[in-house]
Regions:
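Bacterial N-terminal signal peptides that target proteins for export
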Residues: 1-10
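Bacterial N-terminal signal peptides
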Residues: 9-18
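Acidic/polar low-complexity flexible segments
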Residues: 25-55, 133-137, 141-198, 248-299
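Sequence/structural segment immediately N-terminal to covalent heme-attachment motifs in c-type
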Residues: 53-68
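The canonical Cys-X-X-Cys-His
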Residues: 64-74, 163
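Sec/Tat signal peptide C-region and signal peptidase I cleavage site
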Residues: 18-24
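Short, well-ordered beta-strand segments enriched in hydrophobic/aromatic residues
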Residues: 112-119, 237-243
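Long, low-complexity, polar/charged, intrinsically disordered or flexibly structured peripheral segments
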Residues: 176-232
Length: 299
């Protein structure tokens, strides 16, 4: 009996070890980095983007070209930063740092999708930019929006489909109106899945958000985000999201699988700013063993 008990004990240990291996921490050293750039967009809304008199790129978009297909070159983004910083497009004043790089890496296994962002956060937002007014006053926030294929043009326009001229902090807009997707609905899968890490203040009070954007942005209700973790070393932030592949539209959680290409965008708030006073990426795609600007590696 003693031998059997020992055998079962060893067998149980082996089972536990196997389970640990199945959910082992991702090995990021084996994952290629894709550098993208995030920039301060000012009051540039989706309506502005689609107006030919203000944005000549509208023609390319109507023909099926993506924003990044036009604006990204070998040297980075080709955009008119002086125009974005001018009073017409940033009436409260632009940050000193208009653009900065973010490295993106991604892994997936049989259960989870992992996305890691690495960046150095500037702390030079305009003096009149809106900032956190309650403790903890989060010094940095990093968010990812994952687009549903049911959102028309999500692969082309990225998160700009949620940014409209009538949302809060836009000139003359309703101060209570949040980001939204036109004709958005959870049941039909017409929404953006939204996850965010918030740093807290002075190393305390970090938290995470698992929400979505339909007829408005909702910062709760999601169940797919396992955890969002962040650390800062020598001024460089590393933020890692662990999210289940499985989701449920009722919770605002999209479902992902190998062979899928996912539209996504990145937004970084620095210097305790809120609302539109952030740096955002163009729309990119994440490929899970599929074509994409960023390749998610299977581990």
């Amino acid at each position: 009996m003693k031998i059997k008990a020992t055998s079962f004990s060893v067998f149980g240990v082996l089972l536990g070890f196997g389970a640990q291996l199945a959910h082992a921490a991702p090995d990021w050293s084996q994952v290629p980095k894709r550098d993208i750039q995030v920039f301060h967009p000012g009051v540039v809304s989706h309506e502005w983007v689609m107006q030919k008199s203000s944005h000549s790129g509208r023609t390319g978009l109507t023909k099926g070209e993506s924003c990044v297909g036009c604006h990204e070159g070998k040297a980075g983004l080709d955009i008119d930063l002086k125009k974005l910083a001018a009073k017409e497009l940033e009436p409260v004043g632009a940050p000193k740092t208009m653009i900065f790089p973010v490295s993106v890496q991604s892994i997936f296994d049989d259960t989870n999708l992992y996305i890691r962002l690495t960046f150095k956060a500037p702390a030079d937002a305009a003096a009149d930019a809106s900032r956190e007014d309650a403790s903890p006053k989060h010094e940095v926030k990093a968010a990812i929006m994952l687009g549903s294929p049911q959102v028309e043009h999500s692969a082309q326009h990225g998160c700009w489909l949620t940014c409209h001229k009538d949302v809060r902090s836009m000139p003359g807009a309703d101060p209570k109106k949040k980001k939204y997707v036109e004709h958005g609905e959870l049941a039909g899968g017409v929404y953006y899945d939204y996850i965010q890490w918030k740093s807290g203040e002075a190393g305390k009070g970090a938290t995470q958000v698992d929400g979505h954007v339909t007829t408005e942005r909702v910062n709760k209700g999601g169940k797919a985000l396992v955890k969002a973790e962040g650390e800062v070393k020598d001024g460089v932030y590393t933020v890692t999201f662990t999210r289940k592949l499985a989701g449920n539209n009722a919770d605002g959680d999209l479902t992902f699988a190998a062979g899928q290409t996912i539209p996504f965008g990145v937004a970084i708030h620095t210097d305790k700013t809120v609302w539109r006073y952030h740096h955002v990426s163009m729309g990119y795609t994440l490929g899970l063993r599929a074509p994409g600007d960023v390749k998610a590696i299977k581990q």
